[in-house]
Amino acid sequence: MLNIEKARTVSAGLPSAIRLKVARTPEELEDVYRLRYQVHVIEDGKFGEQSFPDGRIVDAFDDMSYVANIVAYEGSEAVGTLRINLDSGQGLPPEEHYNFGDFRHGVTESWNRNHDTPARIGSASMLAVQRSWRHRRDVIRAMFKLGAGIGHSWDGSHIIAAVNAKTAGMYERIGFESLDSEQWIEGIGDHVVPMACKFSAFHSWAFGDLIDSLKTLDFFSYRFQRVILAADKVVFRQGDDHGEAYIVDIGAIRISKGGESGEELTLATLGHGQLFGELSLIDTQPRSAQATTLTTTELIALDREDFFSELEAQPHRIRDMLKIFPSVCAAPMNWPLCWRMVPPSSVLSIR
């Protein structure tokens, strides 16, 4: 049963919406680099004598083949960021501060004995959250959840980090373990703790039973965004034309529709693990109902552009993707919509 009243009280004073995504545009990446500088240098006074004349912190690891800079926005303002990397031969950011050689050797030997594919080690680094937002654990958790999905989509086996000693407890709560005592890093001007975790454990913490119940969404991990909303906020209105589908991770959603006499009719109340708005991914028609948060709510979001990009990239998985829409594609009136999803090269494979 949804405990709506208890959760509703938590939302008092929250901003209307916080959106978390992977920074992809030049403008979003600029927001990431400037936020790092604002947090680490201006707010926290770290990085000692290092000079950042342009007010940005950016390094070679931002140009790696496997890099994802996650950014959290309140409106147009970036309030938090986290970087995820996967090693492709040039090392990882935490190895600038600690020798993870023994850990690498041990997990690589163990992994390779028990798996057909080699160990793939990634990292979490450059966590930066505005001081006024550091009490918002839900925002920080949501950044790490996005990171877990990204690492999973890259087939990562393990993740390492050299974390601020003050935040080590937070990392432990999401599955990381300390590899050594805290170390003083002169270049940063602070103590760090080397930590590591299996990506499978990290992913399990982030998604729990969601992927078990919605297995066909697994291959969209890199495309997901997350949206955090206070109670009584509209996700979308009847008649809107924005193409985005959602899964409820935390909280509750009311689906409603305007009646003939002007009253609002409740069609459904949705909770953890339930999918809604999925027809908008394949149909450009306006929304047929309204979705409103009943409590503080965290949603996993997938937009139409990302959905079709993944469809084109993995045409061999079209049959699995169609399983996301069992009720939609079962209705004859929607068959033309579902058929438009199928690339010509996949027609034979789904007959």
Describe the function of each predicted region:
Residues 90, 94-178, 182, 188-191:
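Acyl-donor binding region in acyl/amide transferases
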Residues 60-71, 91-93, 243:
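A short helix-loop-beta-strand connector motif used in the catalytic cores of GNAT acetyltransferases and
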Residues 69-71, 76-86, 123, 280:
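Conserved beta-strand in the GNAT
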Residues 108-109, 268-326, 330:
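Cyclic-nucleotide recognition modules
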Residues 73-77, 251, 262, 303:
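A glycine-centered beta-loop-beta connector
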Residues 209-266, 271-276, 287, 350:
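Regulatory nucleotide-sensing modules
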Residues 7-58, 67-73, 78-79, 213-216, ...:
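Short amphipathic alpha-helix that is part of the acyltransferase structural core
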Residues 28, 194-234, 281, 313-326, ...:
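Cyclic nucleotide-binding regulatory module and flanking cytosolic helices
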